[in-house]
């Protein structure tokens, strides 16, 4: 997490919230605009987060999501007041990460419904960078997993109006009822896939990044990095990527 700061543009202000000071980013990066806070006996972590929301921060960093209240802070900071949020967690798999964060939100009393809590979690998880340390003491990135929320589609129809018989109308009604109960009881909220994996000492691209995340990444890059990333995407995925500003310029022509 500390090393990732090098790759964040210096124009982006960093806002750090920890339960105990561990990152020491202001000492490592003395030229960066960094505000670090931790809770005390008289000032809660939630109060720290509320103050940080008003300090014009670009990146929120939550040191370690190890307790239920900290999970709530992470969700809040990822949804408002920053471009993106970084945090650490000890989940072994991506589904375990989603489940752990969802359960933390429920135990903290932020949500009462499992499905609603899980929807909020997957809406803020873009990438999971999973590090491992083997028995030789080597530490490396085992995988980078992308989370893709599944958008709910309206699949209900009014075909029953076209039916002439009561039996036909009931059949169409039961089709809609089946769709409703399937969405209510067993709807898939997200998909996940590894975009990069570590195999035999090398990193291998396994799946393309989703179009939405590619565009969001380009929108937050400077011109030089954006051009390099476009070449990378074209070379490895065969995708012609564009920023929102590219589309505006094209329409202006």
Where are these regions (language model features)?
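Post-Walker A alpha-helix
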Residues: 1-2
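Switch/coupling sub-region of P-loop NTPases
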Residues: 5-122
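Amphipathic, soluble alpha/beta structural segments
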Residues: 66-79, 84-100, 137, 217-252
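NTP-binding/hydrolysis catalytic cores, primarily Walker-type P-loop NTPases
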Residues: 142-253
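Phosphate-binding/switch region of NTP-binding enzymes
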Residues: 119-152
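A broadly conserved detector of short glycine/acidic/proline-rich loop/turn motifs that flank catalytic sites
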Residues: 20-21, 41, 66, 133-135, ...
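A generic structural signal for short, solvent-exposed coil/turn residues
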Residues: 8, 29, 136, 187-188
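Intrinsically disordered, low-complexity boundary segments flanking structured domains
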Residues: 22-27, 114-118, 127-132, 173-185, ...
